[in-house]
């Protein structure tokens, strides 16, 4: 009986993954470019539509000095917008699949049932899937940047020198993009990469050169993002400086707490419920569930 179940899982998993990809593509197809996408389709400082890579470079230079420091995410956004909605739908679908696979690689669970499970969690536990995965500006900032972040973390968490040819070279741009991703995860992955280096020093008395290079480039990306002149220009336009430091801290904490309750808490509640159900199933079947999914 168990062998039949394993065989069924082998056949069903790729079908479910393909169905998930089709659904993700279709949702992308139904959601058109909107809101900030319309502005980022221009050179930003004028209503002129972007036509080529040169326009994007000029737009991002203006953006960096006048609006904000997320240059990597917004340059990628403009490239996707330039490609058009048809290609954006395909790229977004491919990035969703890749993100799920990267999660499986980091977890060292590289079989199709795990891939489908990862995709299910990316969609099912997403606090606001429309605005973070299917709205193009949100996808560029969170879906695509999450891919770069996981790729960078994979190098540090699953390091095997023989499987990472040329890493001394390509870890530099990868670290720069990861650090330059967004104001929360950029510093977080830098700290995690630093922790890995410290642990390797404790265990092996040294760390590979590429780890230092990646850490430094990640830190450089984070600094370039946070210290962007546009951040201060935009902050001045919002009138935040009119409030005292203590009041600004209160407003920020209130906004964070509200965001946690509205977006993060439901996802955390669902995660806890799923873990309890899975734990119960494992206890009931005496590890049979793990045997089945590990086909």
Describe the role of every protein-language-model region.
Residues 8-35, 39, 218-229:
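Transmembrane signal-anchor helices characteristic of membrane glycosylation enzymes that use polyprenol
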Residues 23-65, 77-78:
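Extracytoplasmic loop-helix module adjacent to an early transmembrane segment
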Residues 62-86, 90:
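Short hydrophobic/aromatic helix or loop-helix immediately within or flanking a transmembrane segment
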Residues 90-113, 151:
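Transmembrane-helix motifs of polytopic, lipid-linked glycan transferases
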Residues 118-157, 182, 295:
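Membrane-interface micro-motifs in multi-pass membrane enzymes
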Residues 167-189:
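Membrane-interface alpha helices of multi-pass inner-membrane proteins
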Residues 188-216:
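Perimembrane helix-loop-helix junctions
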Residues 284-290:
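Conserved small/polar residues in nucleotide/adenosyl-binding loops
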């Amino acid at each position: 009986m168990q062998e039949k179940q394993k065989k069924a899982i082998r056949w069903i998993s790729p079908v479910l993954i393909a169905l998930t990809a089709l659904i993700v593509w279709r949702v992308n197809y139904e959601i058109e470019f909107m809101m900030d996408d319309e502005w980022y389709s221009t050179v930003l400082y004028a209503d002129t539509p972007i036509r080529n890579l040169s326009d994007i470079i000029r737009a991002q230079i203006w953006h960096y000095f006048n609006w904000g420091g997320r240059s990597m995410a917004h340059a990628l956004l403009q490239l996707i917008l330039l490609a058009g909605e048809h290609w954006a739908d395909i790229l977004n679908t491919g990035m969703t699949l890749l993100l799920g696979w990267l999660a499986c690689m980091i977890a060292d669970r590289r079989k199709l049932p795990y891939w489908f499970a990862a995709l299910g969690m990316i969609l099912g536990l997403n606090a606001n899937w429309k605005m973070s995965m299917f709205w193009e500006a949100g996808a560029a900032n969170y879906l695509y940047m999450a891919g770069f972040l996981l790729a960078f973390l994979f190098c540090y968490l699953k390091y095997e020198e023989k499987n990472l040819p040329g890493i001394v070279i390509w870890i530099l741009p990868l670290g720069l993009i990861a650090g330059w991703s967004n104001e929360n995860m950029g510093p977080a992955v830098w700290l995690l990469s630093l922790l890995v280096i410290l642990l390797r020093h404790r265990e092996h008395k040294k760390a590979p050169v590429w780890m230092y290079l990646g850490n430094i480039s990640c830190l450089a990306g984070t600094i370039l993002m946070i210290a962007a002149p546009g951040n201060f220009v935009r902050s001045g336009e919002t009138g935040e400086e009119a409030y005292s430091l203590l009041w600004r801290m209160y407003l920020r904490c209130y906004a964070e707490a509200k965001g946690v309750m509205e977006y993060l808490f439901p996802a955390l509640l669902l995660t806890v419920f799923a873990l309890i159900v899975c734990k119960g199933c494992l206890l009931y079947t005496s590890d049979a569930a793990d045997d089945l999914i590990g086909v």
